[in-house]
Amino acid sequence: MEATSQQFMSQSYLNAQETTTRATKNYLTSLHSTRKQPSKPLKRPAISSPLNPMHPHVYRVEPVNFKVLVQRLTGAPEHETVQAKPLKTSDDAAKQSSSSFAFDPSSSWGDFSFQNPANISRW
């Protein structure tokens, strides 16, 4: 009976070892495998050509004006020159505001006596 149980134990042990060995082998071979090429190459849909193919524009130019034409075609687009309105400076604003304050009797801004350094020290 002992011989049968030992043989059974050793057989189950060998089967377990064989299973782990196969699993390890499969794992190692998967690490070293390369990706197979697809059986059929992928075909991309062909881009249909337009019904009316575009023809390049042909410029007829004198050799003297060639440089000007090339610069005009390859250069930056020309911008329209728009004159900017002059900015109001603080001097202009002060002139406008001082005249309005001078004629407004209810405005306290018309009194410029507080700008004197002697008057500032009293505050």
Curated annotation (Swiss-Prot):
Comp. bias intervals (Polar residues): 109-123
Region feature (Disordered): 24-55, 77-123
UniProt main location, coarse: nucleus
Basic and acidic residues bias locations: 77-94
Signal peptide (UniProt feature, chain positions): none
GO biological process: cellular response to hypoxia; flower development
Localisation: Nucleus
Reported function: May function as negative regulator of flowering transition.
Classification lineage: Eukaryota, Viridiplantae, Streptophyta, Embryophyta, Tracheophyta
Low complexity biased stretches: 97-108
Composition bias type Basic residues, residue spans: 33-43
Keyword Cell cycle included in the entry's annotation: no
Keywords, alphabetical: Flowering, Nucleus
Protein name: VQ motif-containing protein 29
Motif VQ per UniProt: ranges: 66-75
GO CC annotation, single: nucleus
Alphabetized Pfam families for the sequence: VQ (PF05678)
Domain of life: Eukaryota
Miscellaneous comment as given in the Swiss-Prot or TrEMBL entry: Plants over-expressing VQ29 have delayed flowering.
